[in-house]
Structure formats: structure tokens, C-alpha cells
């Protein structure tokens, strides 16, 4: 436990420790780490709860958490460093640095700029291609980027916002090509070391024996909180690989709030580049407020820059990002005009916890009448759970439960191939069918008949919370035409982009040849 400059915390923070315990209890969070910086000083860095449920080791300021997509700002900063050195421009075409780079549309392949890789406006749909690396797959980063050529575009190029991860793998390859270093080495030498982030690790594979690291937790079947196996994002670390601590992220926030100036007074990146990273490229539609108590958090504008989300809060520009990972979620928030930053790292999957803490801290420093953010976000969680229940009941009500499959079970047992993911195999195991994603060890489960030629895959790993409908269509002659999938629950993480797969049966001799 570490606290500095506690006397400078505002009056609204006097009961902060008790409020943190309330957040942990309300949202069933084993452990939280928080850091707050103001005017270049670290006012608070502290851990609450435990690294792993059922074990006594406490969360501390230097406990490592997966920061997931908070990594994207490091990728943008890396490109900024190279731009400041004149080794690239964010306006360069990607193919000028990676001649083999391809999207599914030749025009987009040729026109994609490095800045476009960061701004979520490529025409890819939400989370498109994420199954190439989520959950852990055996593909390499190079294979992920090469398979991007087969991922279909669902929107117009630079037309609208749709968050993706896969283009940050391309950004990682650009950094490696231009710098001549691995991305792990570049981050360590050019960012982690100069900033002073001594405990930070490039990804889960770089965790060392004895590291003070949190363990992720998920609610199995959306109910029972248990530990989860660590994810390895070694094949897309540019999008979300980094493990860091509240202590190290406080240093990172201070460099950001200082306009890129390092503790030794030297620039990590130029003020010009920071201005561009923090400038809106892609506008984001603003959602309606579904819980009245959250009205104060609704922004007047929202958009995305280079590795950063941009919006406003109570009249102040807010630069922020969240990170989502199996078993861990986080949020980093900056109010540049206040020289204020707060990071919240948690070892569970409910973003309500980090939002409640963040807005509570911001309100205390802005000295506005307090909102009970814990209660407000509890209502949002309750509504999301209720909506998921309504969705499931609609499926149940529409089900023709006494219908039967068109074909004998053995006829569905074959290898199916999607142009970008690759193979999904169905095998008959006695009286049941088993489904396996060939490159994803965790995606193995049992098919349960739902209705007609629709099944549900129940994954063996119940921490995934990603059971999916599996729908078969037939040719006029009664042969299998294709298999499509879609997540059942609206609570399933968007990175399980099953709906983007178009799986067709592979002729037996072709499958055998593979």
C-alpha cells in the first residue's frame, strides 16, 4: 500500500477507502488498484482486496494487471516517436512500409494510411477478425495480418466508427519494420525504461517468476466468480498485450499530462504529435441514457483519436481508454485542463466498477455535488442482465422444441472452413456432436440440438460466457451448404465475432490434405 501527498486529496476523497470496499462488494471484485495524479504529483497509488480470490496476497500499487486495450496508446506513442525522428509519417500509406499488406478491398489496401490503422474507421465491423487471436490462438502476428486480407468489410472506408483490434497488429508490424526492432524491445527501450515503468511487461509471455501479478476472474455462466486461465495475446500485443501496475501507469499518465515530457525533462514525443493523438479523427455516436442516474456521465461529444477515446465530462475535455481482457478490465482517464489523471485496474470483467471509481474521483477533484456512481452503475448492470434475460426468453418462445434435424447427426460431422479464420471441425462422439476451432484450444464444446437445423454450442470452458447458436443451411439436394454462428447472449464479449464467419464444408480429400 502506497499513498503520497494524501493531504492534497480533496474533501470528497476522505472516505475513499470505504467507498472502494463498497465498490468491490457491489460488483464482486476481488482486487482493484488505483492511481491518481495531479499537477505532476502522484497523490495516491493504492491496492484494495486480493490478487486471487481465496488467497491472502493483497493487491498493491505495484501489482501487475493486464491493461488490455490501454496498450493502444503505447502503440500510438511508438509511432509518434518514429514520426518525430522522421522515419515515418502518420500520413504514409501502409503499403509503403509493408508492401504485402492487404485488406479485402484493393482500394482500401492501397489507400490505408498509418493513421487509419489507429482510428477505427476502416470499414471493418466491430471486433472483426478478433477470433484470430481471441481467445488465445496458435496463429503468429504475421499470419493474423496476412489473414486480414480475407476479413470482409461491412462499411465504407473512413465512413463511420467501428472499434477493431486487428489493425493494431498491422501497426505493430509497421513499428517493427521501421525501427528494425521487435515491438517488445522497442517498448522496453523507447518507452518503459525512459518513463521509469520498471515493472511493466510487454505481454503475458513476458511475466517473470515472482512477479507480483493479479489473477483474472470471470463469472462462469454469468453467475459464479472463479479464476480464469491467463490469455496470451502474443500475436496481437500491439492492440492489448501490456501488463502494468497502478504505480507504473501513474508515471505514464504524468508524461501524458506533461505533453510528452519525461521525468528527466527530455521529450518522449513532441507536443505536435500529442496534439494529433488527442485530436478527433472519427466521431462516435452518443448513446441514449438508459439509466437516468447516469445522465451526468453522458458526453456532449465523443470520438476517437490515435489510440485514445475523446469526449467531455462536466465541461472538461476527457482523454481516456478502457481495456477488456478475459478476467481483467481497466480504465485510464485524463482531464488535461486539470492536469488530473486516474487509472483503475481490476481483476474481474465488470466495467461498472472502474467507471464508478473513475467518476467518483473526477467529481471529488471538480468539487461538484456527489453522485452515487456505485448505485447508478449497479442499476446499469441490473438492466443489462435483465435485457439479456428478455433476449433469451424471446429465443425460447420462438423455439420449435419438437422439431428434428434434417440430417442424421453423422452428416453434420465434417470440417468446415472460413476464408479468414480457417477450420472448424465437428466430430461425432457417440450420440453427440463436438465442435472444435482448429487454431483455438479453448473453443471446444458440445452441440445441443435447438430446433430444425440449429444447434447451440456449449463451450467446455464455462468462463468464456460465449455460447453460440450454430445454424446449418442445406442445398436443394439436401447436402450441407454452410454453417453460420452467432453469440446467444448480448453480454458476450464482442471479440467473439462468430457472426462474421462463413463456414462451408471442406471436401474430404481437401481436409485430409490439410
Residue ranges and their predicted role:
Residues 7-67, 87-89, 96-97, 103-104, ...:
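Short, conserved catalytic-motif segment at the N-terminal edge
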Residues 159-163:
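Cytochrome P450
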Residues 31, 53, 58-61, 66-70, ...:
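Active-site helix/loop module of the DD-peptidase/beta-lactamase fold
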Residues 113, 166-167:
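Mid-domain, small-residue-enriched loop/turn segments at the edges of structured enzyme/sensor domains
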Residues 75:
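Active/ligand-binding-proximal structured segments within catalytic/core domains
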Residues 45-48, 127-133, 188, 201-206, ...:
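Short, solvent-exposed loop/turn and secondary-structure capping segments
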Amino acid at each position: 500500500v502506497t499513498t503520497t501527498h494524501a493531504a492534497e486529496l480533496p474533501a470528497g476523497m476522505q472516505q475513499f477507502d470505504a467507498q472502494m470496499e463498497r465498490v468491490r462488494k457491489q460488483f464482486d471484485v476481488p482486487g482493484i488498484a488505483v492511481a491518481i495524479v495531479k499537477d505532476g504529483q502522484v497523490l495516491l497509488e493504492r491496492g484494495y482486496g486480493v490478487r486471487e480470490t481465496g488467497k491472502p496476497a493483497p493487491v498493491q500499487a505495484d501489482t501487475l494487471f493486464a491493461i488490455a486495450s490501454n496498450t493502444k496508446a503505447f502503440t500510438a506513442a511508438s509511432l509518434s516517436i518514429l514520426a518525430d525522428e522522421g522515419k515515418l509519417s502518420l500520413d504514409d500509406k501502409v503499403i509503403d512500409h509493408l508492401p504485402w499488406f492487404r485488406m479485402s478491398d484493393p482500394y482500401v489496401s492501397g489507400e490505408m494510411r498509418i493513421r487509419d490503422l489507429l482510428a477505427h474507421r476502416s470499414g471493418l465491423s466491430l471486433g472483426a477478425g478478433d477470433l484470430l487471436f481471441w481467445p488465445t490462438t496458435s496463429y503468429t502476428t504475421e499470419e493474423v495480418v496476412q489473414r486480414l486480407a480475407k476479413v470482409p468489410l461491412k462499411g465504407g472506408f473512413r465512413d463511420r466508427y467501428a472499434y477493431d483490434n486487428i489493425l493494431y497488429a498491422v501497426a505493430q508490424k509497421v513499428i517493427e519494420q521501421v525501427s528494425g526492432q521487435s515491438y517488445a524491445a522497442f517498448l522496453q527501450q523507447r518507452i518503459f525504461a525512459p518513463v521509469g515503468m520498471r515493472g511493466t511487461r510487454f505481454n503475458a509471455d513476458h511475466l517473470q517468476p515472482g512477479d507480483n501479478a493479479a489473477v483474472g476472474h470471470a463469472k462462469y455462466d454469468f453467475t459464479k466468480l472463479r479464476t480464469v486461465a491467463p490469455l496470451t495475446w502474443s500475436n496481437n500485443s500491439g492492440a492489448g498485450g501490456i501488463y502494468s501496475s497502478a504505480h507504473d501507469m501513474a508515471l505514464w499518465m504524468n508524461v501524458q499530462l506533461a505533453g510528452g515530457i519525461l521525468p528527466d525533462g527530455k521529450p518522449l514525443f513532441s507536443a505536435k504529435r500529442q496534439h494529433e493523438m488527442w485530436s478527433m479523427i472519427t466521431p462516435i455516436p452518443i448513446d441514449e441514457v438508459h439509466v437516468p442516474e447516469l445522465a451526468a456521465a453522458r458526453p456532449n461529444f465523443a470520438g476517437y483519436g490515435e489510440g485514445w477515446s475523446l469526449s467531455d465530462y462536466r465541461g472538461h475535455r476527457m482523454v481516456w481508454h478502457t481495456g477488456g481482457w478475459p478476467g481483467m478490465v481497466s480504465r485510464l482517464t485524463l482531464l488535461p485542463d486539470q492536469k488530473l489523471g486516474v487509472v483503475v485496474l481490476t481483476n474481474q470483467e465488470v466495467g461498472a466498477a472502474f467507471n464508478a471509481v473513475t467518476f467518483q474521483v473526477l467529481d471529488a477533484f471538480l468539487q461538484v455535488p456527489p453522485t452515487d456512481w456505485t448505485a447508478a452503475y449497479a442499476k446499469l448492470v441490473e438492466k443489462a442482465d435483465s435485457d439479456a434475460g428478455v433476449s433469451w426468453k424471446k429465443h425460447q418462445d420462438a423455439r420449435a422444441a419438437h422439431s428434428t434435424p434434417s440430417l442424421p447427426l453423422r452428416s453434420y460431422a465434417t470440417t468446415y472452413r472460413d476464408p479468414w479464420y480457417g477450420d472448424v471441425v465437428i466430430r461425432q462422439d457417440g450420440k453427440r456432436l463436438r465442435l472444435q476451432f482448429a487454431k483455438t484450444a479453448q473453443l471446444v464444446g458440445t452441440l445441443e440440438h435447438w430446433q430444425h437445423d440449429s444447434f447451440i454450442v456449449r463451450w467446455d470452458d464455462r468462463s468464456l460466457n460465449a455460447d453460440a447458436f450454430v445454424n446449418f443451411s442445406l442445398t436443394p439436394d439436401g447436402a450441407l451448404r454452410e454453417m453460420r454462428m452467432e453469440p446467444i447472449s448480448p453480454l458476450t464479449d464482442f471479440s467473439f465475432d462468430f457472426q462474421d464467419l462463413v463456414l462451408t464444408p471442406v471436401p474430404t480429400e481437401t481436409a485430409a490434405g490439410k
